[in-house]
Swiss-Prot record:
Keywords: Cytoplasm, DNA-binding. GO terms for cellular component: bacterial nucleoid; cytosol. This is Nucleoid-associated protein BC_0025. Its main location: cytoplasm. GO terms for molecular function: DNA binding. It is found in: Cytoplasm, Nucleoid. Belongs to the YbaB/EbfC family. InterPro entries: YbaB-like_sf, YbaB/EbfC. The keyword Nucleus does not apply.
Length: 109
């Protein structure tokens, strides 16, 4: 009886190690995936990776109005928030498959 218990424990440890390895790989892949946030009908584009790092900001020339810098700032902010929201969604969908059923506090995948 003791022997079966140890076998189950070893099996569980192997499963945990595999899950840990798979999670590390998924985290690494998140850094390679990108999402795009936009505002102003595509006049502003912000590109972020799955680690929520902003990689690029594109501003179309016609949206730049020296008389209305505030509008440009608002559009950049909106596009950035859109990109970060999409990065969150990407992270949650990627990492969520590992934490399904673990009852982690909200916002943790």
């Amino acid at each position: 009886m003791m022997r079966g218990g140890m076998g189950n424990m070893n099996n569980m440890m192997k499963q945990m190690q595999k899950m840990q390895k798979d999670m590390a790989k998924a985290q690494e892949e998140l850094g390679e995936k990108t999402v795009e946030g936009t505002a102003g009908g595509g006049m502003i584009t912000v590109i972020a990776n799955g680690h929520k790092q902003i990689l690029e900001v594109k501003i179309k020339e016609e949206v730049v109005d020296p008389e209305d810098i505030e509008m440009l700032q608002d559009l950049v902010l909106a596009a950035t928030n859109d990109a970060l929201k999409k990065a969150d969604e990407l992270s949650n969908s990627t990492m969520g498959k590992f934490t399904k059923g673990l009852n982690l506090p909200g916002g943790m995948f």
